[in-house]
Amino acid sequence: MTTHKFEHPLNEKTRIYLRVESLLRQAHLASGFADNHQYQLFFRALFDMVEIFEQIQLKSELAKDLEKQRLSYRHWLNVEGVDQEALNSLLNEIDVVHSQLMGAERFGQALKEDRFLSSIRQRFNLPGGSCCFDLPALHYWLHLPIERKKHDANQWQKSLKPLSDALTLWLKLARETGHFKAQIARAGFFQSDADEANILRLHIPMKYGVYPMISGHKNRFAIKFMAFENGQACSQDVEFELAVCS
């Protein structure tokens, strides 16, 4: 059965984490510059991340969240039936990633200080502003050998590696706390309680032709399914799978 997967954050911090994860993925996928237009996606992702970093102290928040996960997993040390080797390996991974995160400079600082990036960032935000007459420096860079462009892209992304590693680990562990269970949204509506949850994950069969509209917070949430073809609230029962992740 064909399904579409959907995630929804239940607090603002997790919302930002998911946005940054998406931007990191976009930058990585576009950095191969397989066609002449991927550079727009690449630079847009970089500049969007810089804007987020300017507004939020993401480094300190992520460090605190990793520490919470570490303390949570330490409670399982010496507990009978728990794979202690795997647990110690995970705790070591958290320690290494946390240490690298704390030793890193402010997120996005290297990107802001890069002469080329800073020269194109402002005009890149203009509608259609990536034309050669608006950004001659970018136009020149685009005509450099592909090896040079890939090298530059890798260096810019390398400055974000401590962030990427920490965010990837935190989201991986958060997602693994939830287990998918079959649910039914009666007349297209479902609501439930949550216990300090961060993320909802849904698997929705495409046959229903619906998408979810979700509201709520870490302790309670509601899901209303909308029909894609007309944008109206769905009136049929919808069977789907749901994982509540903390």
From Swiss-Prot:
Protein location: Cytoplasm
Chief place of localization: cytoplasm
Superkingdom assignment: Bacteria
Keyword Cell division: yes
Pfam families cross-referenced by the UniProt entry: ZapD
GO biological process terms on file: division septum assembly; FtsZ-dependent cytokinesis
InterPro entries from the UniProt entry: ZapD (IPR009777), ZapD_C (IPR027462), ZapD_sf (IPR036268)
Record's GO cellular component terms: cell division site; cytoplasm
Gene3D superfamilies per the UniProt record, alphabetical: YacF-like (1.10.3900.10), YacF-like domains (2.60.440.10)
SUPFAM superfamilies attached to this UniProt entry: YacF-like
Keyword annotations of the record: Cell cycle, Cell division, Cytoplasm, Septation
Subunit comment: Interacts with FtsZ.
Protein family membership: Belongs to the ZapD family.
Primary role: Cell division factor that enhances FtsZ-ring assembly. Directly interacts with FtsZ and promotes bundling of FtsZ protofilaments, with a reduction in FtsZ GTPase activity.
NCBIfam families the UniProt entry points to: PRK05287.1-3 (NF003655), PRK05287.1-4 (NF003656)
Stated name of the protein: Cell division protein ZapD
